[in-house]
A protein has these predicted regions:
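Conserved ABC transporter NBD signature motif
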Residues: 60-68, 80, 113-114, 120
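Helix-to-loop junction immediately C-terminal to a conserved catalytic motif
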Residues: 52
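The feature captures the beta-strand-to-loop junction immediately N-terminal to the Walker
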Residues: 37-39
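Conserved ABC ATPase signature
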Residues: 132-136
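A short, proline-enriched helix->beta-strand linker immediately N-terminal to the Walker B motif
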Residues: 151-155
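Catalytic Walker B motif of ABC-type/P-loop ATPase nucleotide-binding domains
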Residues: 157-161
């Protein structure tokens, strides 16, 4: 297995009086797509936000390679090569696709290298280049949101539930694009509720429950063990269709 790019050790996060993350331990291998799974309210999104510094860990450590980023602020963490695609997507509805991407590029420069990178993974965006982002479909908005995150090369991309609310055919298109992104060597940590997408994309997996990591391993092994899926995720047989 590749060496870890990101390592969380004993991470705790409090939000107000609530103890959300309780000793979270797992790592994200370099060049792999790691799925972060769990039932609603398990702490998955809080984990992503804590990695990015949007919430501060109250105990434990987070390392990006050898750098301790536990108490770093969000701009500093982003400058180290971590990008975040929130569930809300974070796009500007009144701006065109081109303008959204230019805002995400350094100095607003969409040069040929950046355009080639975007269109390699999401060629469909060419058709909507000058269209306001608010007029895009859900799947197109998700493609734009991920493109904003990768317009510059990143060490790590955090993605929160990219398939939520999308039709099955659109999910399959998004899976294909993310597989290509993974093949490029981009390291990804993804929260996902759609088990088909998780099974199709994941190399490694960490499963959360009540703010704790209750399982780590390879996604292929979890996908092959329906009993383990039921115990960890509450999945029934119809979830595999």
């Amino acid at each position: 297995m590749p060496e870890p790019l990101l390592t969380l050790a004993g991470v705790n996060t409090h939000i107000g009086n609530y103890h959300i993350l309780q000793g979270v331990d797992f790592s994200v291998p370099r060049g792999e797509l790691t799925m972060l799974l769990g039932r609603n309210g398990a702490g998955k999104t809080t984990t992503l936000r804590t990695i990015l510094g949007l919430w501060r860990a109250s105990a434990g450590s987070i390392h990006l390679e050898q750098a301790d980023i536990t108490q770093s602020d969000t701009p500093s963490i982003a400058s180290m090569g971590i990008a975040y695609v929130p569930e809300s997507m974070g796009i500007f509805a009144g701006l065109s696709v081109q303008e959204n991407l230019a805002l995400a590029a350094r100095a607003g420069a969409l040069d040929d290298r950046r355009l080639e990178r975007i269109f390699t993974f999401f060629p469909a965006l060419k058709k909507f280049w000058f269209l306001p982002a608010g007029l895009l479909s859900g799947g197109q908005k998700q493609m734009l949101a991920i493109s904003r995150a990768i317009v510059e090369p990143r060490k790590l991309v955090l993605i929160d539930e990219p398939t939520k609310g999308l039709a099955p055919s659109i999910i399959n298109n998004l899976i294909e694009a993310l597989l290509e992104l993974k093949k490029s060597g981009t390291t990804i940590l993804m929260v996902e509720q759609n088990f088909h997408a998780a099974r199709s994309l994941g190399d490694g997996v960490a499963v959360m429950d009540s703010g704790r990591i209750v399982h780590t391993g390879r996604m292929a092994d979890l996908a092959a063990d329906e009993g383990l899926q039921t115990r960890l995720l509450g999945l029934s047989l119809d979830a595999h269709q």
